[in-house]
């Protein structure tokens, strides 16, 4: 996929801010490039990152039999979480080749490779047949859709 200028700006943002995510978000262990969800059970920022995934998964009623599209998967954090926590199959797509490679490595390290598949693709212009997925997951990534209606 040849990135457009708009896509390249998104890719560049994450490349430039990667060190901040590594430091503040403990990216190497959390795989999260999103904010957390705080309630009375959460005691740390790290827990809040996991809680965000839990709340979204419960709200979406994701089941082990579901096929999930993680639209804007970053380094694979939510995809890996869903595969581990629920056991569903997840396809994660990102604009960034660097994030793709990190997601593949992260999935390998967490032993969820059979359940996850990562690709470089624009979530507003996929090549997936209609109705390929039961759930479309977008944790703090949909804001980057150039055309929200097309998304």
Residue ranges with predicted function:
Residues 124-135:
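A short acidic, Gly/Pro-enriched loop at the edge of an enzyme's catalytic core
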Residues 31-37, 43-64:
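Conserved alpha-helix/loop element of class I SAM-dependent methyltransferases that forms part
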Residues 144-151:
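A short, conserved alpha-helix within the catalytic core of class I
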Residues 67-69, 75-125:
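Class I SAM-dependent methyltransferase SAM/SAH-binding core
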Residues 14, 56, 96:
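Conserved hydrophobic/aromatic pocket- or pore-lining residues that grip, position, or stack substrates
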Residues 138-141:
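A short beta-strand submotif of the Rossmann-like class I SAM-dependent methyltransferase core
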Residues 24-30:
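Short coil/turn segments at secondary-structure boundaries
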Residues 1-24:
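N-terminal auxiliary segments of SAM/dcSAM-dependent transferases
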């Amino acid at each position: 996929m040849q990135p457009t200028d708009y896509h390249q700006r998104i890719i560049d943002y994450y490349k430039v801010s990667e060190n901040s995510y590594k430091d503040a978000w403990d990216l190497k262990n959390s795989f999260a490039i999103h904010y957390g969800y705080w309630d009375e059970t959460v005691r740390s920022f790290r827990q809040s990152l996991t809680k965000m995934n839990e709340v979204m998964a419960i709200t979406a009623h994701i089941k082990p039999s579901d096929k999930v599209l993680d639209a804007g998967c970053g380094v694979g954090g939510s995809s890996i979480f869903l595969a581990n926590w629920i056991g569903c199959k997840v396809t994660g797509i990102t604009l960034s080749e660097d994030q793709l490679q990190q997601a593949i490595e992260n999935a390998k390290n967490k032993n969820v490779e059979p359940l996850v598949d990562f690709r470089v693709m624009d979530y507003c212009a996929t090549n997936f047949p209609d109705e390929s997925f039961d759930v479309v997951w977008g944790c703090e990534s949909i804001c980057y859709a150039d055309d929200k209606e097309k998304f």
